[in-house]
Amino acid sequence: MQKARIRLTGTDYQKVEEVCEKIKEIAERTGVNLAGPIPLPTRKLVVPIRKSPDGEGTATWDRWQMRVHKRLIDLDADERALRQLMRTQVPKDIGIEIVLES
């Protein structure tokens, strides 16, 4: 049987967890095996910026950062489960990637 590997990415971890819960509910309703959600390492993107625009004075810095949270879910690729998975509403700032493996 094929397996579907689902990778979720987003900057808001609460929205990522909400989508994980929706996928868990689909797996329970359809009765397919589910492994996960497996939390992958959070990537921190840090950008240091000088506060002073002209370069004079003391060197004070602002540090802006964005955290990218990732989750990995494996489930059996049942046709009914995948159809329901494709119909779920996912927030537009959450990236979802589905790969079918044999």
From Swiss-Prot:
Q: Which domain of life is it from?
A: Archaea
One GO molecular function term? structural constituent of ribosome
For this protein, the record's Pfam families field holds: Ribosomal_S10
- InterPro entries noted in UniProt: Ribosomal_uS10, Ribosomal_uS10_CS, Ribosomal_uS10_dom, Ribosomal_uS10_dom_sf, Ribosomal_uS10_euk/arc
Keyword tags = Ribonucleoprotein, Ribosomal protein
Q: Which GO terms describe its cellular component?
A: small ribosomal subunit
One GO BP on record is:
translation
Gene3D superfamilies xrefs: Ribosomal protein S10 domain
Assembly and partners are described as: Part of the 30S ribosomal subunit.
What is the annotated role of this protein in its UniProt record? Involved in the binding of tRNA to the ribosomes.
Family, according to the entry, reads as follows: Belongs to the universal ribosomal protein uS10 family.
Protein name in UniProt: Small ribosomal subunit protein uS10
Give the organism, scientific name.
Answer: Methanospirillum hungatei JF-1 (strain ATCC 27890 / DSM 864 / NBRC 100397 / JF-1)
Q: Coding gene?
A: rps10
